Curated annotation (Swiss-Prot):
One record GO biological process: tRNA threonylcarbamoyladenosine modification
Keyword Manganese on entry: no
A GO term from the CC aspect: cytoplasm
Reactions performed catalytically: L-threonylcarbamoyladenylate + adenosine(37) in tRNA = N(6)-L-threonylcarbamoyladenosine(37) in tRNA + AMP + H(+)
Name of the protein this chain belongs to: tRNA N6-adenosine threonylcarbamoyltransferase
Gene Ontology molecular-function annotations: iron ion binding; N(6)-L-threonylcarbamoyladenine synthase activity
Co-factor requirement: Fe(2+)
Residues annotated to bind substrate: 134-138, 167, 180, 272
Organism encoding this protein: Salmonella typhi
Family named by the database record: Belongs to the KAE1 / TsaD family.
Residue positions binding Fe cation: 111, 115, 300
Protein backbone atom coordinates (compact mmCIF):
# COMPACT_ATOMS: atom_id res chain seq x y z
CA UNK A 1 0.00 0.00 0.00
CA UNK A 2 1.28 3.46 -0.96
CA UNK A 3 0.41 6.75 0.74
CA UNK A 4 1.08 10.22 -0.63
CA UNK A 5 1.93 12.66 2.18
CA UNK A 6 1.44 16.45 1.98
CA UNK A 7 2.98 18.83 4.55
CA UNK A 8 2.15 22.57 4.41
CA UNK A 9 1.73 23.59 8.05
CA UNK A 10 4.24 26.47 8.05
CA UNK A 11 7.05 27.44 5.67
CA UNK A 12 8.08 24.13 4.09
CA UNK A 13 6.22 22.38 1.30
CA UNK A 14 6.90 18.68 1.79
CA UNK A 15 5.64 15.86 -0.44
CA UNK A 16 6.52 12.18 -0.03
CA UNK A 17 5.32 8.71 -0.96
CA UNK A 18 5.58 5.86 1.55
CA UNK A 19 5.10 2.16 0.77
CA UNK A 20 4.29 -0.15 3.69
CA UNK A 21 6.55 -2.85 2.22
CA UNK A 22 9.33 -0.93 0.46
CA UNK A 23 9.52 2.12 2.71
CA UNK A 24 10.07 5.67 1.47
CA UNK A 25 9.78 5.85 -2.32
CA UNK A 26 9.98 9.61 -2.87
CA UNK A 27 10.69 12.72 -0.82
CA UNK A 28 10.40 16.26 -2.20
CA UNK A 29 10.89 19.39 -0.11
CA UNK A 30 10.82 23.11 -0.80
CA UNK A 31 11.84 25.55 1.92
CA UNK A 32 10.58 29.14 2.00
CA UNK A 33 13.49 30.39 4.12
CA UNK A 34 14.69 32.90 1.51
CA UNK A 35 11.14 34.18 1.02
CA UNK A 36 10.74 35.09 4.70
CA UNK A 37 14.34 36.04 5.55
CA UNK A 38 13.88 39.76 4.83
CA UNK A 39 10.99 39.87 7.31
CA UNK A 40 12.84 38.11 10.13
CA UNK A 41 10.15 35.43 10.44
CA UNK A 42 7.34 33.63 8.66
CA UNK A 43 4.70 35.84 7.01
CA UNK A 44 1.54 33.67 6.96
CA UNK A 45 0.03 35.17 3.79
CA UNK A 46 3.26 34.76 1.83
CA UNK A 47 3.61 31.20 3.12
CA UNK A 48 0.11 30.27 1.93
CA UNK A 49 0.61 31.76 -1.52
CA UNK A 50 3.91 29.96 -1.98
CA UNK A 51 2.35 26.63 -0.96
CA UNK A 52 -0.26 27.21 -3.68
CA UNK A 53 2.53 27.59 -6.24
CA UNK A 54 4.68 24.68 -5.08
CA UNK A 55 2.39 21.87 -3.86
CA UNK A 56 1.13 20.42 -7.16
CA UNK A 57 4.52 20.61 -8.97
CA UNK A 58 6.17 18.82 -6.02
CA UNK A 59 3.49 16.10 -6.12
CA UNK A 60 4.26 15.61 -9.80
CA UNK A 61 7.98 15.47 -8.98
CA UNK A 62 7.39 12.88 -6.23
CA UNK A 63 5.39 10.64 -8.57
CA UNK A 64 8.17 10.92 -11.13
CA UNK A 65 10.86 10.17 -8.52
CA UNK A 66 8.99 7.02 -7.45
CA UNK A 67 8.22 6.06 -11.08
CA UNK A 68 4.51 5.93 -10.20
CA UNK A 69 1.26 7.34 -11.55
CA UNK A 70 -1.84 8.54 -9.73
CA UNK A 71 -3.41 5.10 -10.10
CA UNK A 72 -0.62 3.64 -7.94
CA UNK A 73 -1.56 5.76 -4.89
CA UNK A 74 -3.84 4.07 -2.34
CA UNK A 75 -4.45 7.03 0.01
CA UNK A 76 -3.58 10.71 0.42
CA UNK A 77 -2.45 12.02 3.83
CA UNK A 78 -2.21 15.71 4.63
CA UNK A 79 -1.32 17.79 7.67
CA UNK A 80 -4.60 18.99 9.19
CA UNK A 81 -3.04 20.84 12.14
CA UNK A 82 -1.64 22.37 14.17
CA UNK A 83 -0.07 25.18 12.14
CA UNK A 84 -0.85 28.36 10.21
CA UNK A 85 -4.48 28.19 9.14
CA UNK A 86 -3.94 29.47 5.59
CA UNK A 87 -0.98 27.20 4.99
CA UNK A 88 -2.86 24.20 6.39
CA UNK A 89 -5.84 24.90 4.13
CA UNK A 90 -3.66 24.72 1.02
CA UNK A 91 -2.40 21.22 1.78
CA UNK A 92 -5.78 20.04 3.06
CA UNK A 93 -7.61 21.33 -0.02
CA UNK A 94 -5.13 19.80 -2.45
CA UNK A 95 -5.01 16.52 -0.53
CA UNK A 96 -8.76 16.21 -0.18
CA UNK A 97 -9.30 17.14 -3.84
CA UNK A 98 -6.78 14.60 -5.11
CA UNK A 99 -8.27 11.89 -2.92
CA UNK A 100 -11.71 12.63 -4.38
CA UNK A 101 -10.41 12.73 -7.96
CA UNK A 102 -8.40 9.53 -7.53
CA UNK A 103 -11.18 7.80 -5.58
CA UNK A 104 -8.93 6.96 -2.62
CA UNK A 105 -9.23 7.74 1.11
CA UNK A 106 -8.07 11.08 2.51
CA UNK A 107 -6.27 10.93 5.87
CA UNK A 108 -5.92 13.99 8.13
CA UNK A 109 -2.64 13.85 10.07
CA UNK A 110 -1.60 15.63 13.26
CA UNK A 111 1.61 17.53 12.54
CA UNK A 112 3.20 16.70 15.90
CA UNK A 113 2.31 13.01 15.60
CA UNK A 114 4.20 13.15 12.31
CA UNK A 115 7.25 14.49 14.13
CA UNK A 116 6.84 11.97 16.95
CA UNK A 117 6.77 9.07 14.47
CA UNK A 118 9.60 10.36 12.25
CA UNK A 119 12.22 8.19 14.03
CA UNK A 120 10.18 5.17 12.90
CA UNK A 121 11.51 5.85 9.40
CA UNK A 122 15.03 4.90 10.51
CA UNK A 123 16.63 1.44 10.33
CA UNK A 124 16.51 1.08 14.13
CA UNK A 125 13.07 2.38 15.18
CA UNK A 126 12.11 2.59 18.86
CA UNK A 127 9.75 0.12 20.51
CA UNK A 128 6.96 1.23 22.83
CA UNK A 129 6.85 2.52 25.51
CA UNK A 130 9.03 5.62 25.47
CA UNK A 131 9.24 9.24 26.57
CA UNK A 132 9.10 11.64 23.64
CA UNK A 133 10.68 15.09 23.69
CA UNK A 134 8.95 17.14 21.00
CA UNK A 135 11.05 20.25 20.59
CA UNK A 136 10.53 22.72 17.76
CA UNK A 137 9.80 26.36 16.97
CA UNK A 138 6.21 26.04 18.09
CA UNK A 139 6.24 23.26 20.66
CA UNK A 140 8.28 21.97 23.58
CA UNK A 141 6.56 18.98 25.14
CA UNK A 142 7.33 15.81 27.04
CA UNK A 143 4.96 12.97 26.14
CA UNK A 144 4.51 9.49 27.59
CA UNK A 145 3.99 7.20 24.59
CA UNK A 146 2.71 3.66 25.15
CA UNK A 147 1.36 3.08 21.64
CA UNK A 148 0.01 4.86 18.57
CA UNK A 149 -2.43 7.46 19.84
CA UNK A 150 -1.69 6.54 23.45
CA UNK A 151 -0.15 9.86 24.41
CA UNK A 152 -0.05 11.48 27.83
CA UNK A 153 1.23 15.03 28.15
CA UNK A 154 3.80 15.13 30.97
CA UNK A 155 4.96 18.72 30.59
CA UNK A 156 5.20 21.59 28.12
CA UNK A 157 6.46 25.14 27.77
CA UNK A 158 4.32 27.72 29.53
CA UNK A 159 5.60 30.50 27.22
CA UNK A 160 8.12 30.37 24.36
CA UNK A 161 9.01 27.04 22.79
CA UNK A 162 12.72 26.18 22.75
CA UNK A 163 13.03 26.74 19.00
CA UNK A 164 11.27 30.09 19.28
CA UNK A 165 13.68 31.13 22.04
CA UNK A 166 16.62 30.12 19.81
CA UNK A 167 15.31 32.25 16.93
CA UNK A 168 14.53 35.29 19.12
CA UNK A 169 17.92 35.19 20.84
CA UNK A 170 19.64 34.78 17.48
CA UNK A 171 17.92 37.96 16.33
CA UNK A 172 19.27 39.79 19.41
CA UNK A 173 22.73 38.59 18.39
CA UNK A 174 22.28 40.05 14.92
CA UNK A 175 21.84 36.74 13.11
CA UNK A 176 19.57 36.28 10.11
CA UNK A 177 16.39 34.18 10.00
CA UNK A 178 16.16 31.29 10.70
CA UNK A 179 18.44 32.01 13.59
CA UNK A 180 18.44 28.75 15.57
CA UNK A 181 20.96 26.83 13.45
CA UNK A 182 23.11 29.96 13.04
CA UNK A 183 23.14 30.52 16.81
CA UNK A 184 24.32 26.94 17.32
CA UNK A 185 27.10 27.46 14.79
CA UNK A 186 28.17 30.64 16.59
CA UNK A 187 27.98 28.84 19.96
CA UNK A 188 30.55 26.31 18.75
CA UNK A 189 33.09 29.16 18.71
CA UNK A 190 32.14 30.36 22.19
CA UNK A 191 34.00 29.93 25.46
CA UNK A 192 32.19 27.74 27.97
CA UNK A 193 31.66 29.31 31.38
CA UNK A 194 32.35 32.95 30.57
CA UNK A 195 28.64 33.64 31.02
CA UNK A 196 26.26 31.50 33.04
CA UNK A 197 22.58 31.58 32.17
CA UNK A 198 19.84 30.23 34.46
CA UNK A 199 18.24 26.81 33.91
CA UNK A 200 14.57 27.87 34.09
CA UNK A 201 12.16 25.89 36.29
CA UNK A 202 14.72 23.21 37.15
CA UNK A 203 14.82 24.28 40.82
CA UNK A 204 11.23 23.16 41.40
CA UNK A 205 9.29 19.92 40.86
CA UNK A 206 7.44 19.29 37.62
CA UNK A 207 8.08 18.82 33.94
CA UNK A 208 6.96 22.15 32.46
CA UNK A 209 9.38 24.48 30.66
CA UNK A 210 9.86 28.24 30.42
CA UNK A 211 12.27 29.81 27.93
CA UNK A 212 11.13 33.42 27.53
CA UNK A 213 13.29 34.54 30.46
CA UNK A 214 16.44 33.29 28.74
CA UNK A 215 15.82 35.70 25.87
CA UNK A 216 15.57 38.59 28.36
CA UNK A 217 18.69 37.39 30.16
CA UNK A 218 20.53 37.29 26.82
CA UNK A 219 19.40 40.83 25.96
CA UNK A 220 20.65 42.15 29.31
CA UNK A 221 23.95 40.28 28.92
CA UNK A 222 24.50 41.74 25.45
CA UNK A 223 23.68 45.24 26.71
CA UNK A 224 26.11 44.93 29.65
CA UNK A 225 29.05 43.32 27.85
CA UNK A 226 29.11 44.75 24.35
CA UNK A 227 28.68 42.86 21.13
CA UNK A 228 32.14 42.12 19.76
CA UNK A 229 32.34 38.85 17.84
CA UNK A 230 33.83 36.73 20.65
CA UNK A 231 31.42 38.10 23.25
CA UNK A 232 28.48 37.27 20.99
CA UNK A 233 29.84 33.75 20.52
CA UNK A 234 30.28 33.34 24.28
CA UNK A 235 26.70 34.51 24.88
CA UNK A 236 25.42 32.11 22.22
CA UNK A 237 27.32 29.30 23.94
CA UNK A 238 25.87 30.18 27.34
CA UNK A 239 22.34 30.37 25.92
CA UNK A 240 22.59 27.04 24.10
CA UNK A 241 24.10 25.33 27.14
CA UNK A 242 21.22 26.62 29.30
CA UNK A 243 18.54 25.35 26.91
CA UNK A 244 20.22 21.97 26.42
CA UNK A 245 20.79 21.47 30.15
CA UNK A 246 17.18 22.39 30.91
CA UNK A 247 15.85 19.93 28.34
CA UNK A 248 18.18 17.22 29.62
CA UNK A 249 17.16 17.72 33.27
CA UNK A 250 13.46 17.55 32.40
CA UNK A 251 13.96 14.46 30.21
CA UNK A 252 15.73 12.74 33.09
CA UNK A 253 12.82 13.54 35.41
CA UNK A 254 10.31 12.24 32.86
CA UNK A 255 12.20 8.97 32.50
CA UNK A 256 12.37 8.60 36.28
CA UNK A 257 8.65 9.29 36.72
CA UNK A 258 7.58 6.84 33.99
CA UNK A 259 10.24 4.19 34.52
CA UNK A 260 10.80 4.01 30.76
CA UNK A 261 14.23 3.16 29.31
CA UNK A 262 13.77 4.74 25.88
CA UNK A 263 13.82 8.41 24.91
CA UNK A 264 12.66 9.67 21.51
CA UNK A 265 13.60 13.18 20.41
CA UNK A 266 11.73 14.83 17.53
CA UNK A 267 11.12 18.23 15.98
CA UNK A 268 13.41 20.81 14.41
CA UNK A 269 15.55 21.45 17.50
CA UNK A 270 16.26 17.71 17.75
CA UNK A 271 18.79 18.26 14.95
CA UNK A 272 20.94 20.29 17.37
CA UNK A 273 24.24 18.44 17.74
CA UNK A 274 24.91 19.58 21.30
CA UNK A 275 21.47 18.40 22.43
CA UNK A 276 21.94 15.04 20.71
CA UNK A 277 25.33 14.52 22.30
CA UNK A 278 24.17 15.46 25.81
CA UNK A 279 21.07 13.24 25.67
CA UNK A 280 23.06 10.33 24.23
CA UNK A 281 25.56 10.67 27.09
CA UNK A 282 22.75 10.81 29.65
CA UNK A 283 21.00 7.72 28.24
CA UNK A 284 24.26 5.78 28.14
CA UNK A 285 24.77 6.47 31.84
CA UNK A 286 21.20 5.35 32.50
CA UNK A 287 21.72 2.22 30.36
CA UNK A 288 18.87 3.31 28.18
CA UNK A 289 18.47 4.22 24.51
CA UNK A 290 17.85 7.48 22.68
CA UNK A 291 16.28 7.66 19.22
CA UNK A 292 15.91 10.49 16.73
CA UNK A 293 15.34 10.98 13.03
CA UNK A 294 18.06 11.88 10.55
CA UNK A 295 18.52 15.69 10.39
CA UNK A 296 16.46 16.16 7.21
CA UNK A 297 13.49 14.47 8.91
CA UNK A 298 13.75 16.60 12.08
CA UNK A 299 12.39 19.70 10.38
CA UNK A 300 9.01 19.72 8.62
CA UNK A 301 8.79 17.21 5.77
CA UNK A 302 6.34 15.11 3.80
CA UNK A 303 7.91 11.77 4.72
CA UNK A 304 6.71 11.92 8.32
CA UNK A 305 3.19 12.81 7.14
CA UNK A 306 3.11 9.96 4.63
CA UNK A 307 4.27 7.50 7.32
CA UNK A 308 1.86 8.80 9.97
CA UNK A 309 -0.89 8.69 7.35
CA UNK A 310 -0.09 5.05 6.67
CA UNK A 311 -0.32 4.24 10.38
CA UNK A 312 -3.62 6.08 10.77
CA UNK A 313 -5.11 4.61 7.59
CA UNK A 314 -4.42 1.10 8.85
CA UNK A 315 -6.23 2.12 12.05
CA UNK A 316 -9.28 3.11 10.03
CA UNK A 317 -8.90 6.90 10.06
CA UNK A 318 -10.25 8.74 6.99
CA UNK A 319 -11.78 12.17 6.30
CA UNK A 320 -15.16 13.06 4.85
CA UNK A 321 -15.64 15.31 1.82
CA UNK A 322 -15.25 18.51 3.82
CA UNK A 323 -11.94 20.36 4.17
CA UNK A 324 -11.27 20.93 7.87
CA UNK A 325 -8.06 22.02 9.60
CA UNK A 326 -7.22 22.70 13.24
CA UNK A 327 -4.59 25.43 13.80
CA UNK A 328 -4.62 24.43 17.49
CA UNK A 329 -4.89 20.70 18.10
CA UNK A 330 -3.67 19.04 21.33
CA UNK A 331 -1.81 15.80 20.62
CA UNK A 332 -3.53 14.10 23.56
CA UNK A 333 -6.88 14.36 21.75
CA UNK A 334 -5.84 11.80 19.12
CA UNK A 335 -7.55 8.40 19.39
CA UNK A 336 -5.56 5.25 20.06
CA UNK A 337 -4.85 3.11 17.01
Amino acid sequence: MRVLGIETSCDETGIAIYDDKKGLLANQLYSQVKLHADYGGVVPELASRDHVRKTVPLIQAALKEAALTASDIDAVAYTAGPGLVGALLVGATVGRSLAFAWNVPAIPVHHMEGHLLAPMLEDNPPDFPFVALLVSGGHTQLISVTGIGQYELLGESIDDAAGEAFDKTAKLLGLDYPGGPMLSKMASQGTAGRFVFPRPMTDRPGLDFSFSGLKTFAANTIRSNGDDEQTRADIARAFEDAVVDTLMIKCKRALESTGFKRLVMAGGVSANRTLRAKLAEMMQKRRGEVFYARPEFCTDNGAMIAYAGMVRFKAGVTADLGVTVRPRWPLAELPAA
